């Protein structure tokens, strides 16, 4: 594995490619996190994407430079974490297998079972203390730490979940066989 620094080349590609390549990466926020086991890609011409209708105050980070965080509030309840790729595209972090700061995650989430700590984008946000203040920050700097896998793990792929538009796109990726994904493939 290697630490991602300020080099944006990894993210300056199609979000579909980046979403697949993030599986198996280690990610932490202020030392709390784990291995990314599920992602979804969103593109600017994708009716399910926040960027589909253009730039707004809410999605401005999606149109900023690659390798930055895009944070949004889902259903007025959960902060969701995305990694910005090319302009108007991002990767939603849907699930993480907890590895570091598990007791902190348990306290934040109010649950004991490790599988339930980060299995879903809202749970990821709560467990990692994702907030609007992180929106637009570079992924190569504190409080973030992202280490990409040195070898490609076995992938599962399927249609995205929890959306009502462009549901046919097979842009959801996961670590094959992981029990930490939000939904089975």
UniProtKB/Swiss-Prot annotation:
PANTHER family in the cross-refs: DNA-3-METHYLADENINE GLYCOSYLASE (PTHR10429:SF0)
HAMAP family: 3MGH
Record has Hydrolase as a keyword: yes
Enzyme Commission (EC) number: 3.2.2.-
Disulfide bridge positions per record: none
First and last residue of the signal peptide: none
Pfam families assigned to the protein according to its UniProt record, in alphabetical order: Pur_DNA_glyco (PF02245)
Similarity remark: Belongs to the DNA glycosylase MPG family.
Enzyme class: hydrolase
GO MF term set: alkylbase DNA N-glycosylase activity; DNA binding
Keyword GTP-binding carried by entry: no
InterPro entries for the chain: Formyl_transferase-like_C_sf (IPR011034), MPG (IPR003180), MPG_sf (IPR036995)
Record key words, sorted: DNA damage, DNA repair, Hydrolase, Plasmid
Biological-process GO terms, alphabetical: base-excision repair
Protein name: Putative 3-methyladenine DNA glycosylase
